[in-house]
From Swiss-Prot:
Pfam families recorded: ACOX, ACOX_C_alpha1, Acyl-CoA_dh_M
Highest classification ranks of the organism: Eukaryota, Viridiplantae, Streptophyta, Embryophyta, Tracheophyta
UniProt KW keywords: FAD, Fatty acid metabolism, Flavoprotein, Lipid metabolism, Oxidoreductase, Peroxisome, Transit peptide
CDD domains in UniProt: AXO
Role, per record: Catalyzes the desaturation of long-chain acyl-CoAs to 2-trans-enoyl-CoAs. Active on substrates longer than C14 and mostly with C18-CoA. Activity on long-chain mono-unsaturated substrates is double than with the corresponding saturated substrates.
UniProt family annotation: Belongs to the acyl-CoA oxidase family.
Gene: ACX2
Upregulation: Induced by dehydration and abscisic acid (ABA).
Source species of the chain: Arabidopsis thaliana
Listed name of the protein: Acyl-coenzyme A oxidase 2, peroxisomal
An annotated GO cellular component: peroxisome
GO biological process: fatty acid beta-oxidation; fatty acid beta-oxidation using acyl-CoA oxidase; long-chain fatty acid metabolic process
Amino acid sequence: MESRREKNPMTEEESDGLIAARRIQRLSLHLSPSLTPSPSLPLVQTETCSARSKKLDVNGEALSLYMRGKHIDIQEKIFDFFNSRPDLQTPIEISKDDHRELCMNQLIGLVREAGVRPFRYVADDPEKYFAIMEAVGSVDMSLGIKMGVQYSLWGGSVINLGTKKHRDKYFDGIDNLDYTGCFAMTELHHGSNVQGLQTTATFDPLKDEFVIDTPNDGAIKWWIGNAAVHGKFATVFARLILPTHDSKGVSDMGVHAFIVPIRDMKTHQTLPGVEIQDCGHKVGLNGVDNGALRFRSVRIPRDNLLNRFGDVSRDGTYTSSLPTINKRFGATLGELVGGRVGLAYASVGVLKISATIAIRYSLLRQQFGPPKQPEVSILDYQSQQHKLMPMLASTYAYHFATVYLVEKYSEMKKTHDEQLVADVHALSAGLKSYVTSYTAKALSVCREACGGHGYAAVNRFGSLRNDHDIFQTFEGDNTVLLQQVAADLLKRYKEKFQGGTLTVTWSYLRESMNTYLSQPNPVTARWEGEDHLRDPKFQLDAFRYRTSRLLQNVAARLQKHSKTLGGFGAWNRCLNHLLTLAESHIETVILAKFIEAVKNCPDPSAKAALKLACDLYALDRIWKDIGTYRNVDYVAPNKAKAIHKLTEYLSFQVRNVAKELVDAFELPDHVTRAPIAMQSDAYSQYTQVVGF
Ligand SMILES: Cc1cc2nc3c(=O)[nH]c(=O)nc-3n(C[C@H](O)[C@H](O)[C@H](O)COP(=O)(O)OP(=O)(O)OC[C@H]3O[C@@H](n4cnc5c(N)ncnc54)[C@H](O)[C@@H]3O)c2cc1C
C-alpha cells in the first residue's frame, strides 16, 4: 500500500518537523493540564510536569489479596493443571471438530484427572463454582461454557427444578461426566419469549408416561449446547398437556421441564424418535457443540418430570404449591438465574484479561516523543489514557459489583428469602446485561489500542471478542433483561406509594422520591471543589438523582400513553427511556458497591489506589451524561467543566498506578499469554511466534 508519507509533497525533514511540532503541542497540553486556577481544585491546579513522577506507592500484594478473594487455591490448581498439560491447551488454529473434542477432553481432564468437581459446588458453594468457571473460562472460553452447560444448565436444572428422587438418581453421573447433558429451552421460533414455546409433553395415563413432541418446524429445539456430539440427556422445556374430561379433552398447564434421554448410554447412538442436527460453525465458542433437536412421540416415564413446582399424580391429577401458571413459570425461571450470575462474573474475567493485555502493551509500546528525546510510552498519550483508564476503573467497579452479586446469590440459595430472591433476580439480569455489553465494546477498544499487533490472533483479542460476543444474547438477551430491571423498578415505585417494602438494593428509592426529586439545590449545583467532587456522597447522590428522575418521568409517560395505546403500546413507546432507566439504576448499584469496597479495604495504599479508580469511574460516568445533569441545572456550567478536568486528571493519576492495578488481577502468564502483553522481552517473544 502507498504510504501517506509517499503522497506528501513536503521533504521528509519538513514533514518530520511538522509532525514533531504537532506532537510537542499535544504533549505540552497533556503534560501541563490547562486548568484554570481555582481554589477548589488545589491538587489539579498544582499539577505540573514534575508532579508526573509523583506517584502513589501501592502495596501490590495487599491490593491483590483484597481483589483475589477466598478461592485463589482452586483457581491456581486449575491454572497449574492446564500449564502442565500442553496437550490440553487450545492452539490458535484448530478446526471446529477438533476444538469440540479438545474441549470435551479439557473438561474430562479437569474433572477426572485434576479432581476438580464443579457440580458439588453448584448448589452448596456457588462462590467456589463461579471461581472455577472464571478460571477455566480464561483457559478457553469454550471450556467455560461447556462446563456451564453440563453443570449449571443441565445439572442445575435437575437439582433445582427436580426433587430428591432426581438428585439421587442423577447427581453422581452428572458430577463424573457419565451423564453428559443439555439444556433444551430455545426453539427455532422462540428464544427470548420462553412462554411461547411449542414443544409438548402430553401425559398418557394408560402407560404412566409423557409423550414429547415437536409439533412443527418452528418448535425444533435450536442452539442446544452439548447436543450435536456429546450429550446423552436433555432437560427439555415443554408445555405440559393433561387429558381432561371436558369438551376440550386436554388442558395446557404451561411450560415445565422434563428429563429426556437423547442418546444410548452404551452405544451413544441417537435414541428412537429423537433427531439431532448440528448447528454448524459459529462466530465463536466453536469448542461447544450446539445442535438442534426434534422429538417424534418420544416416551419418557412420569418420574422424568422435574416436579419441584408442579407434579402429576398416577391418575393424571395436577398439583402445585403455586396457584397460577405465571407463578410457576416465574419460580422455574427464578431457579435458573445462576447462569446469569455466572456470565456476569465471567464477563468481568474477560474484561480483566483484555484490559491487562492492552494496558501492559501500552506501557511497553513507545511511539514518537519530543525531538531528540526517547520515544514515549503510548499510555502517556491522553487519548490512550482516555480509552483505557476509565476502562480499568470500570473493571474494578464491575469486579466488586459481581462479587457482591455472587455473595447475594449464595445467600439466596441458602435462605430462599423471598425479598432476596426478587433482588437477586433483578440484579443478575441487570448486571449480566450491563457488564457483558460493556465488555463486548471494550474488547474492540483494546484491540484498537494495541494497533496492528492487536489484530494478530496470537494476541487473543479476536478469540476473546468472538467467544464473548454471544454473552450479550444467551442466558437472556440483554435488551430483554434490562426491561425486566425497569419493570421491577416500576413495580417497586408503585409499591412505595402503596406503603410496600423495598429490598436492599432498591432501598435508596425510598429517600430518592422525597429528597432527590425536589428541585436541584442551586448552591450545591455550583460547588466545584475537588473534595466535593470526590466525595462519595456527591457522586452517589448524582447517580441516584438521575435514576429517580428517569423513574418518575417514565412512570408518568407510561400512565399517559397507556390510556391511548394500552399497556403493550405504551411500554413500546417508552422503551428506550426504560432501558436508560435500567442502566442508570445498575450503574448506581455498581457505584455504591465500589464505594463500599474502597471503604472496607484494610491497606491504606491499596485503598488510595482504589479510591482513585472509584472516583474516575464515578466522574467519568457523570461526565458522559453531563447533558442530563446540565439540562436540569443539577450542575452549573463551571461545575461541569471542573468535573471534566478532574476526570482527565484522575485518568492520568490512574495511569501512574495502572501497572499495579492490572498486576493485582494476578492473571497467570498463560492466560494473558498474548506475547505483546509480556512485560519483558516482549518483542523477541513475539518474533519467535512468527518464526524468527
Ligand atoms: C452459541 C449459543 C449457545 C446457546 N446455547 C443454548 C442452550 O444451551 N440452550 C438453550 O436453550 N438456548 C441456547 N441458546 C439460545 C439463546 O439462549 C437464545 O439465542 C437467546 O435466548 C435469544 O433468543 P433468540 O435468539 O430467539 O433472539 P430473539 O429473542 O429473537 O432476539 C432477536 C433480537 O430481538 C430483540 N428483541 C426480542 N424481544 C424483544 C423485546 N421484547 N423488546 C425489545 N427487543 C426485543 C432482541 O434484543 C434481539 O436483538 C444459545 C444460543 C447461542 C447463539
